[in-house]
Amino acid sequence: MYKRQAQQQGRLGREIATLEELKNLLGLEKMPEYIESYDISHTFGADNVAGMVVFHNGRPMKSAYKRFAIKGFDGQNDVGSMQEVLTRRFNHYYNDEDGSTFKILPDLILLDGGEPQVRAVLPVVASMGLNVPVFGMVKDSKHRTRAIAVGNGEIEINSHRQVFTLVSCLLYTSPSPRD
């Protein structure tokens, strides 16, 4: 029993250390305990959906995962779809009943995409009167996470092993359009 508790405490310590490293790397004011990640998916330009993945204290919070059917666009429009989804998500924040996971304001938003997605979503968040940091997750030619996109550049994360693993998990655990 003590061994199991020690293992759990060790894992929790690593998760907190990873979140602290992510905070420092991104220049955040506070540790991002509640992170939301968004990814747009489509099937040959149709059936557009967005997945929202939530990590709380460095662990997946599957009960808060959401899928959004994209209603405003036919065909592939990742930037417009991100704007739509974040608008709908934060409308839920303001309008849902207490107890909804939408009533929790994230400490950090990570988007699948680079600077175009970040630049498109920042005004949406600001227009809603919210102050939530937004960054993108940039992939390499092999579709692996390579960097985090900031407003006008990128932060390489390959040398930050634990942060790299966390960000990769956020990106690749997105709910599938067929879930």
Predicted features, each with a name:
Residues P175-D179:
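A short, hydrophobic C-terminal helix/tail in secreted or cell-surface proteins
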